[in-house]
């Protein structure tokens, strides 16, 4: 909407295409959008992506927004997987779509988890288009929708009915495969993207170039309280923060690239399903939404274009905060 030619990545490209095409103002910008289907847990796909992006010419902005916080059970992905098997609409203008291999298999080993051990969420009789519309509608994940069995979150995921997930697990409980997935998605993929796309950013004619690493409070060392849960997620975000702190000053001094780590704020609740229902019944919900989170991620770029150079810092609530 600000005039950029934009590439976005996702494991579910057809779902993304449907969402963007359904936007009321899509005709104004959809010809400048490319949707890339990729699994960022696969470093070979990440490297291939960097080669394609670099070959396309100079790059002004890189936002490392992908994240795996907890692994969900396969049933949560049901509508998204089904949507990848269904045809795209023919009555709307669609963005360009590029897809790498093996991005959203029905039950890939990396998300299969405990399929036989836990209830699997599902919606019967819903089309991909109707599921997309439901995910984009207000109240789609309300307590009432959960109790009625019709909840879908803004990412298109069904409620994960497992009573335990890695958000509450301690170091001896976290599955080794999930540990690896989280590191690959949250810190290894951003490292590869930054390192291999730096020449393309250096070639940009823009006054400033930007790298925004989407971080979280989980990776903050100076926080007064740090519980024992989800150590694998904490260490992944801490690694992303250290990458930012280590490389940002040199990247700015050498190439005028402004790199920051940004906390989106509390926009999701990762606790197990029954815990979420209990606190929702008590009136609690995440204080921010996806629009709030996106605004915080975009803000360092807006500031830079206004002449305020922000780099080498952890940004929370729109201002630098302690690491």
Positions of PLM-derived features:
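Short-chain dehydrogenase/reductase
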Residues: 1-181
């Amino acid at each position: 909407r600000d005039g950029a030619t934009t590439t976005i990545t996702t494991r579910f490209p057809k779902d993304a295409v449907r969402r963007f095409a359904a936007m009321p103002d899509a005709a104004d910008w959809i010809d400048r959008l490319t949707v890339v289907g990729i699994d960022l847990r696969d470093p070979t796909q990440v490297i291939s992506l960097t080669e394609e992006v670099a070959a396309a010419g100079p790059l002004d902005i890189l936002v490392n927004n992908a994240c795996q916080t907890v692994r969900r059970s396969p049933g949560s992905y049901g509508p998204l997987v089904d949507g990848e098997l269904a045809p795209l609409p023919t009555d709307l203008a669609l963005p360009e779509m590029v897809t790498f291999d093996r991005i959203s298999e029905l039950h890939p080993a990396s998300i299969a988890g405990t399929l036989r051990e836990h209830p699997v969420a599902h919606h019967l009789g819903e089309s991909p288009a109707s599921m997309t519309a439901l995910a984009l509608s207000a109240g789609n994940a309300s307590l009432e929708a959960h109790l009625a069995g019709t909840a879908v979150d803004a990412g298109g995921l069904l409620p994960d009915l497992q009573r335990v997930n890695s958000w509450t697990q301690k170091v001896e409980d976290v599955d080794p495969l999930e540990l690896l997935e989280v590191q690959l998605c949250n810190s290894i993929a951003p490292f590869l993207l930054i390192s291999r796309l730096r020449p393309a950013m250096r070639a940009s004619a823009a006054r400033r170039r930007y790298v925004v690493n989407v971080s979280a409070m989980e990776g903050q060392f100076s926080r007064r309280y740090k519980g024992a849960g989800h150590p694998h997620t904490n260490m992944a975000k801490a690694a992303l923060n250290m990458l930012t702190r280590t490389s940002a000053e040199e990247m700015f001094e050498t190439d005028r690239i402004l790199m920051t780590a940004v906390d989106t704020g509390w926009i999701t609740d990762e606790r197990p399903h029954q815990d979420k229902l209990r606190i929702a019944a008590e009136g609690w919900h995440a204080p921010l939404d996806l629009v709030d989170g996106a605004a915080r991620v975009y803000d360092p770029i807006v500031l830079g274009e206004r002449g305020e150079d922000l780099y080498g810092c952890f940004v929370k609530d729109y201002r630098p905060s302690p690491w």
